[in-house]
Structure formats: structure tokens, C-alpha cells
Amino acid sequence: MAKRRISEADGQAALTAALAGDTSRTVLATAVRYLLEELAELAPGNSVEVRVPPFGATQCVAGPKHTRGTPPNVIETDPETWLALATGRIDWQTAVEEARIVASGSRADLHGLLPIMRRPL
């Protein structure tokens, strides 16, 4: 498992600010990275790569490990959608139907792992 880089206090503060409407780059970046770290801790592994450009990416979910090139299971979304998914403000299926997620590969589905954290709307 990768070493955490964002403290719980800093991550929670950024997440709270982002959910309250703070769209500054620093706040969004910290909130996104914090939630990616939470996902990697919740579902350790290397079979799925989750990308949230331009702020971060993580590998998660146990299973076959790739070592070279593009991983076979990739999920990509924007920062706002990632925050919404990770906090239960939108569900996986809705985000897929609205084309807010690009997912490829047989394991590229996080519906059973989300939301990571529940926040009041």
C-alpha cells in the first residue's frame, strides 16, 4: 500500500471546503488526492487505475497486476464528479449514464466501493 501523503485533518478540511463550494485549485487538488488515498486504503491492489486529471491517480482493487504500459482496467473522471461519487452525491450508474465516467476493462467498476464517505447534501 502506498504511503499516505495527506493527513486526515488536511484531507477532511479540504473535502469540507470543496463540498461547501470552494473551487480553488489547492482545495480541489487536496480533496481529490485525499479521496484517492482513501480508495486505495479501502480497496488495496493494482488491478484498476483511477485517474482524476489533473490532480491524481491511484491503483486499487485486488487482482491481476499490470507492470508495463496502460493498465487494462482504467477509470477516468473529472474532479467534481469524483468528489460527488466518493461522497455519495451521485451514484455510479447515474455518472456512467451521464457520461461523467470513462471506464474500460472488466474490473473498471467501483459501484460496490462507493461512496467512500457520506456527507450531508
Which role does the model predict for each range below?
Residues 1-121:
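Feature captures hydrophobic
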